[in-house]
Structures are given as C-alpha cells and as structure tokens.
Amino acid sequence: MNWRALFKPSAKYSILALLVVGIVIGVVGYFATQQTLHATSTDAFCMSCHSNHSLKNEVLASAHGGGKAGVTVQCQDCHLPHGPVDYLIKKIIVSKDLYGFLTIDGFNTQAWLDENRKEQADKALAYFRGNDSANCQHCHTRIYENQPETMKPMAVRMHTNNFKKDPETRKTCVDCHKGVAHPYPKG
C-alpha cells in the first residue's frame, strides 16, 4: 500500500468534501454502535439464549426481583459494566457466548446450567471481586455512607467497619452476599 497517498491532497475531491464524508461516516457508525449495544443489552435479548433454564426465575424470586423498594434489576445491571469503555470491552469479550450457544450441544438447557453452575458462578465472583463489586455499588451507592434508615443496625455496623479497612483487606459485596440473585452452588 502506498502510505504517502493517504497524506496527499486529493486532486478529485476537496478537503471539505472529504471532511464532511468522514464526519457523516463517523456519526452513522457511532449511532449504529450505540443502537446495537442498546439492543443487545435488554433482558429480552439475554433470554433469547438463556431461555430454557431457571436464570430469570431465580432473579425474580430474589430480593433483586422486585423487593420492598419495588425495583427489579435487569440482566445488564449486574452482568455488564456501567462505564462506556469497560461496557464495550465486556460486550466484545462476552460475544464468545454466542459461539457457545451455537456450538455447545445443550448450552441452552437446565441440565447444562446445573452441570456448569459452579464454574460459571466462580467466574462471576472473580469478575465482581476484580472490580470491587462495581456493579453492586452502582445501585447501592449509599452502602458505606449515609445508609438508608431501613438498613438494620448490625448491617450498618458491618458495612461501616468494613469500609474503615484498607482497600487491600476490605471485603467486597460478593464476599458476604454471593448468591443474592442466582443461588450459589454448594460444594
């Protein structure tokens, strides 16, 4: 490829025309990416592959399925990062799950989930521990300071004492609360 040609002014097109075309392509690409990310982050999309097992019912039966506050979490609230760059990276990483859905016999079955639940749960716990349970703290922002009045005194003490520890020795949400949305397997 002739790299010098990329930096030469075009004899055929004006710089303004090239700039406008570049901007239009950039804007269309940006909005197409945003729409794709949004469309693939709905519960309906998640359930298109995870439909034949108990995951959705587990969440609905948990405190995250419409507890006292009346809030029902969506799959992406826990399973996808909330920052734009991390979000895009995670979407790229989990695209391999589509390959698994298409190639692993029985992937979308309760039997597969039961057989692989421990491994999948451990991967999820490692993800949460690796980011200090950022997804939990995205919604539970008041857990360390200005706790809600509905929080039990013992829970206030435990969270306050944990927050006082050095970050390296501090527990993260899933160390005490694993299995709050999906049951954590025994053993």
Swiss-Prot record:
<dbReference type="GO" id="GO:0009055">
    <property type="term" value="F:electron transfer activity"/>
</dbReference>
<keyword id="KW-0812">Transmembrane</keyword>
<keyword id="KW-0249">Electron transport</keyword>
<dbReference type="InterPro" id="IPR051174">
    <property type="entry name" value="Cytochrome_c-type_ET"/>
</dbReference>
<feature type="binding site" description="axial binding residue">
    <location>
        <position position="64"/>
    </location>
    <ligand>
        <name>heme c 3</name>
    </ligand>
</feature>
<feature type="binding site" description="axial binding residue">
    <location>
        <position position="97"/>
    </location>
    <ligand>
        <name>heme c 1</name>
    </ligand>
</feature>
<feature type="binding site" description="covalent">
    <location>
        <position position="173"/>
    </location>
    <ligand>
        <name>heme c 4</name>
    </ligand>
</feature>
<keyword id="KW-0479">Metal-binding</keyword>
<dbReference type="InterPro" id="IPR024717">
    <property type="entry name" value="NapC/NirT/NrfH"/>
</dbReference>
<keyword id="KW-0349">Heme</keyword>
<comment type="subunit">
    <text>Homodimer.</text>
</comment>
<feature type="binding site" description="axial binding residue">
    <location>
        <position position="177"/>
    </location>
    <ligand>
        <name>heme c 4</name>
    </ligand>
</feature>
<feature type="topological domain" description="Cytoplasmic">
    <location>
        <begin position="1"/>
        <end position="12"/>
    </location>
</feature>
<feature type="binding site" description="covalent">
    <location>
        <position position="136"/>
    </location>
    <ligand>
        <name>heme c 3</name>
    </ligand>
</feature>
<dbReference type="GO" id="GO:0009061">
    <property type="term" value="P:anaerobic respiration"/>
</dbReference>
<dbReference type="InterPro" id="IPR038266">
    <property type="entry name" value="NapC/NirT_cytc_sf"/>
</dbReference>
<comment type="similarity">
    <text>Belongs to the NapC/NirT/NrfH family.</text>
</comment>
<keyword id="KW-0408">Iron</keyword>
<dbReference type="InterPro" id="IPR036280">
    <property type="entry name" value="Multihaem_cyt_sf"/>
</dbReference>
<feature type="binding site" description="covalent">
    <location>
        <position position="75"/>
    </location>
    <ligand>
        <name>heme c 2</name>
    </ligand>
</feature>
<dbReference type="GO" id="GO:0046872">
    <property type="term" value="F:metal ion binding"/>
</dbReference>
<keyword id="KW-1003">Cell membrane</keyword>
<feature type="binding site" description="covalent">
    <location>
        <position position="176"/>
    </location>
    <ligand>
        <name>heme c 4</name>
    </ligand>
</feature>
<dbReference type="GO" id="GO:0005886">
    <property type="term" value="C:plasma membrane"/>
</dbReference>
<dbReference type="GO" id="GO:0019333">
    <property type="term" value="P:denitrification pathway"/>
</dbReference>
<protein>
    <recommendedName>
        <fullName>Tetraheme c-type cytochrome CymA</fullName>
        <ecNumber>7.1.1.8</ecNumber>
    </recommendedName>
</protein>
<keyword id="KW-0813">Transport</keyword>
<feature type="binding site" description="covalent">
    <location>
        <position position="46"/>
    </location>
    <ligand>
        <name>heme c 1</name>
    </ligand>
</feature>
<dbReference type="Pfam" id="PF03264">
    <property type="entry name" value="Cytochrom_NNT"/>
</dbReference>
<feature type="topological domain" description="Periplasmic">
    <location>
        <begin position="34"/>
        <end position="187"/>
    </location>
</feature>
<dbReference type="GO" id="GO:0020037">
    <property type="term" value="F:heme binding"/>
</dbReference>
<keyword id="KW-0472">Membrane</keyword>
<keyword id="KW-1278">Translocase</keyword>
<feature type="transmembrane region" description="Helical">
    <location>
        <begin position="13"/>
        <end position="33"/>
    </location>
</feature>
<dbReference type="InterPro" id="IPR005126">
    <property type="entry name" value="NapC/NirT_cyt_c_N"/>
</dbReference>
<feature type="binding site" description="covalent">
    <location>
        <position position="78"/>
    </location>
    <ligand>
        <name>heme c 2</name>
    </ligand>
</feature>
<feature type="binding site" description="covalent">
    <location>
        <position position="139"/>
    </location>
    <ligand>
        <name>heme c 3</name>
    </ligand>
</feature>
<feature type="binding site" description="axial binding residue">
    <location>
        <position position="140"/>
    </location>
    <ligand>
        <name>heme c 3</name>
    </ligand>
</feature>
<keyword id="KW-1133">Transmembrane helix</keyword>
<feature type="binding site" description="covalent">
    <location>
        <position position="49"/>
    </location>
    <ligand>
        <name>heme c 1</name>
    </ligand>
</feature>
<feature type="binding site" description="axial binding residue">
    <location>
        <position position="79"/>
    </location>
    <ligand>
        <name>heme c 2</name>
    </ligand>
</feature>
<comment type="function">
    <text>Quinol dehydrogenase involved in several anaerobic electron transfer pathways. Acquires electrons from the membrane quinone pool and mediates their transfer to several periplasmic terminal reductases and redox shuttles, including the fumarate reductase FccA, the small tetraheme cytochrome (STC), the c-type cytochrome MtrA, the nitrate reductase NapA (either through NapB or directly), the nitrite reductase NrfA and probably also the DmsE subunit of dimethyl sulfoxide (DMSO) reductase.</text>
</comment>
